[in-house]
Amino acid sequence: MQLLHHAQLVTMDEESGGYGLIEQGALVIEAGRISWIGPETDLPAQYADATRRDLGGRLVTPGLIDCHTHIVFGGDRAREFEMRLEGASYEEIARAGGGILSSVRATREADEEALLAAALPRVDTLLAEGVTTLEIKSGYGLDIDSELKMLRVARRVGQLRKVTVRTTWLAAHALPPEYKDDRAGYIREVVIAGMERGHAEGLIDAVDGFCEGIAFTREEMAGIFDHAAKLGLPVKLHAEQLSDLGGAAMAARHGALSADHLEYLGQDGIEAMAASGTVAVLLPGAFYTLRETQYPPMAALRDAGVPIALATDCNPGTSPLTSLLLTMNMGATLFRMTPSECLAGVTRHAARALGLKDRGRLTPGMRADLAVWDIRHPAELTYRIGFNPLHARIVGGELV
């Protein structure tokens, strides 16, 4: 039993509003979970003999959660970055066989060890900023063996590092060249057949897809989600990034955990997400990298009570970003989110976007995933740029 005391505790408890800050707070950890939290002066006598750790007045938040990444991939797309700056659009690059497909070639060619060696430094950068839970998608293999290879690497990341990894099946990311004239065949023979195999092997925690004019239609994704439901797998969707195809509303009707990107989200989608409790995951790194001008409908999302999360969207083409702290600053600066909304977006709401009910808040019964910071006010996490004030990570009650 551990007692962390002399701390400012940022509980992110929804009922408290804002940060849920407890000044001069203490919390007790037993068996990897929070058993008590409150002002230090209110500490129950039963915890008096706990092993004490004085945090020196530091700030403690829930461990950060990056709920949308593509962090396992082969190669890089630095040349594509140059092409965009020379005037080529995301759609033009994709239709010319670049974009996602260039990462597909490199990922197919790489073995598991090479993919793991490339992914771990990216993961370590996130962990160094207080991340304790991480989502990792497939989506750069686009054949069954390569997609499952990516998910095996993702599972190994969780074994080799002190971080919870949630894996997502994203075979419906793009059409590979060998199926360019057989969309139905790809969905049947790779997306669905691979989903069944990956589920049987215990590699899939959720199912995702890219609903866009350059990817998959709303109707195609609905069929994929119907199959995921038969397997008992939750779903999420890349939606309304480049146009409004009604993907978010469709995903919400399927009970999606989240709909992500959402720059072109319309009122129908907002209302459907509010009704289903689907989280809006905003990805300012992609917005920034692509130099987009269409903003997510922040005011309408707030008014409807849609929970809003933030994530890095770490990927080689449109968001080569491995800083959740910078993502928070982008959420505030680009999308006009408040600092408390940004912190909720990488804790409480990010946990909800992954279907995790045991983290993202500092309340009794929650998993003891914590980040300890050398700052005095939680707004500093969003306000400061290029600054990492992490003092320590605590994962499942263990200091790492």
From Swiss-Prot:
It comes from the Bacteria. GO terms for biological process: L-histidine catabolic process to glutamate and formamide; L-histidine catabolic process to glutamate and formate. N-formimidoyl-L-glutamate binds at residues 140, 315, 317. GO terms for cellular component: cytoplasm. Its cofactor is Zn(2+); Fe(3+). Keywords: Cytoplasm, Histidine metabolism, Hydrolase, Iron, Metal-binding, Zinc. Zn(2+) binds at residues 68, 70, 238, 313. One of its GO terms (molecular function) is iron ion binding. It is found in: Cytoplasm. Fe(3+) binds at residues 68, 70, 238, 313. This is Imidazolonepropionase. The gene is hutI.
